[in-house]
Amino acid sequence: TMYRFANLVSPEDLQAIASYLYLEMIKQGYTSVAEFHYVHHQPNGQPYSCASQLSQSIINAANITGINLTLLPVLYMTAGFDGQPLLEEQKRFGNSVARYIDIHNDAAQYCADESQHNVGIALHSLRAVPTEPMSEVINHFANNSSVCPIHVHIAEQTREVEHAIASLGKRPVEWLLENHAVDKQ
């Protein structure tokens, strides 16, 4: 399964996999990639000593192949609108707001000299990032860094829309537009 594979990948494996992918993309005419990066921690769920260790593997792959990269570290906190914890097999994906900000800032610093790279924000979804942490992340980056892309999955399936209505009282797009300044960023 996806989780089993994700829990086996080392930083070196990730760099090799991303390098191969990016080279294949370049061969097909792509010059840029937006990488939604979910896996942030060691297989046991503990952070690496360098917060952005796995992000750096992706940045290195982009440097090796020459593809332009927008790295989008994904914030993933809960398994549902009701705040259920992530599953055991998702432990490499989960972050607190503080740890997510560290990963983002460390990755941005790592590629600061690479003008063809950018680090944005990816909030997994309304169901996987509760409203307060979502606001905290958006406000932090609005106040403390240059303009960077912000991405959020609105809903992956109809059931998620139904859960949003039950939990937030609104459809996901409606809630997002009423609670955050959605713009070209």
PLM region spans:
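Metal-coordinating catalytic core of metallo-dependent amide/deamination hydrolases
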Residues: 41-185
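Metal-associated gating/positioning segment near the N- to mid-region
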Residues: 1-46, 53
